[in-house]
Amino acid sequence: MSYIEKLGDNMVKRLKILIDNEFSNLIIEFKRNVKKSFEGEAFVTIGIDENDKISYISIEPLDKDLKEGIKRIKVL
């Protein structure tokens, strides 16, 4: 069972992945209000499958504030 399947259909409906081809931005959006945002430099790795669909995204923060922000994230 995949992670998305464990979250259920409701979570999938609230998840949106946007690709801005002009600026090469990748945005993963959840249908939630934003209380605070964190930004900073990071090493980012994006794995894709044989159909060029996202397999995983890894974010390794270099910036202290971004690192602390990621630590605060609640997955479920």
Curated annotation (Swiss-Prot):
Give the top-rank taxon of the lineage listed in the UniProt record for this protein.
Viruses
Effect annotated for changing R72K:
In strain: Isolate variant II
Its name, as the record gives it, is: Uncharacterized protein 76
From what organism does this protein derive?
Answer: Sulfolobus islandicus rod-shaped virus 1 (SIRV-1)
